[in-house]
Amino acid sequence: MAFQLTPLRVALVAGEPSGDLLGASLLGGLHARLPASSRYYGIGGPRMSAVEFDAHWPMEKLAVRGYVEALKHIPEILRIRGELKRQLLAEPPDAFVGIDAPDFNFGLEQALRGAGIPTIHFVCPSIWAWRGGRIKKIVKAVDHMLCLFPFEPELLEKAGVAATFVGHPLADEIPLEPDTHGARIALGLPDGGPVIAVLPGSRRSEIELIGPTFFDAMELMQQREPGVRFVVPAATPVLRALLQPLVDAHPSLSVTLTEGRAQVAMTAADAILVKSGTVTLEAALLKKPMVISYKVPWLTGQIMRRQGYLPYVGLPNILAGRFVVPELLQHFATPDALADATLTQLRDDANRRALTDIFTDMHLALRQNTAQRAAEAVARVIDSRKPR
């Protein structure tokens, strides 16, 4: 990094919890790589704020899932983006890093790039999984892409976008061999007997749509596997309050409801029933058999079905290039089907051993010291724009 008279300024935008995790990891690397006087600001969550990040807006303002669901929030989201764009154009940062949230960030990045501000995007959109013209948007908006998965840079570079594979911070954070015994002690669960972790989502809309179905499936599983225990982590106090009535409505269930501690809950489990998302990668890194599911409103589902061309949605299956764990989506996600599939994952020891091998290979491939790699890439972009 060339000698810097004024403090470096890096603007970042993360729009949801997974982006907050990535942003916090990147900020840790940037604090180690860039001068101590550097400033970091923009939109982020609590993890980013904990590592000297100035959040001008909380990321919850952007964390809206689904095409239809987003419509009611569009005016406020556009207002925030417009105000942030004006701020950044008036006082240009040395670099802008958009963390996932492509619908919000690409338009902003294109405007900033047009004004000569270096733009970096962290998390390549699933151009390998979805139809449409996102690659064209990337070409217009992004100077450099930070990729979580090893096959992505080649796809981007063919389109003329510079890219760096940085791995995934979860692969750095999670040990290769999970401590199931220690996790059960931490949650007050007995060491013996089967435990199933159930994760119905990290948003109110997700829990409202699939939570009742998951709990009905839990009832069936307990009938078919007496002695099974369930642990259900709630991402926030608000979501815990939303889940509590479901727990109360099923008094026969042996269920532990936690606030946060999703990774501990999954570590303690023998099998996992999980709503699709980044958490499925976390489950794979913990070497756990799982069933992946989701339900979205009908119109959102129709749009997603027409845009997608891969036969799977779960990250473990996408990374493996084949179905290694079952997916039950939309109308296929019935309580009976979910119960059967989850109990099969629980009971099949040969499948468990095969998944452990597959998931260990994934873990090693993604364990790349992401914070350092990503920070080095950002520093190179900034340095390349400095006058010599």
From Swiss-Prot:
Pathway: Bacterial outer membrane biogenesis; LPS lipid A biosynthesis. One of its GO terms (molecular function) is lipid-A-disaccharide synthase activity. The gene is lpxB. Keywords: Glycosyltransferase, Lipid A biosynthesis, Lipid biosynthesis, Lipid metabolism, Transferase. GO terms for cellular component: membrane. It holds the Pfam family LpxB. Its EC number is 2.4.1.182. It catalyses: a lipid X + a UDP-2-N,3-O-bis[(3R)-3-hydroxyacyl]-alpha-D-glucosamine = a lipid A disaccharide + UDP + H(+). Condensation of UDP-2,3-diacylglucosamine and 2,3-diacylglucosamine-1-phosphate to form lipid A disaccharide, a precursor of lipid A, a phosphorylated glycolipid that anchors the lipopolysaccharide to the outer membrane of the cell. HAMAP family: LpxB. Belongs to the LpxB family. PANTHER family: LIPID-A-DISACCHARIDE SYNTHASE, LIPID-A-DISACCHARIDE SYNTHASE, MITOCHONDRIAL-RELATED. GO terms for biological process: lipid A biosynthetic process. This is Lipid-A-disaccharide synthase.
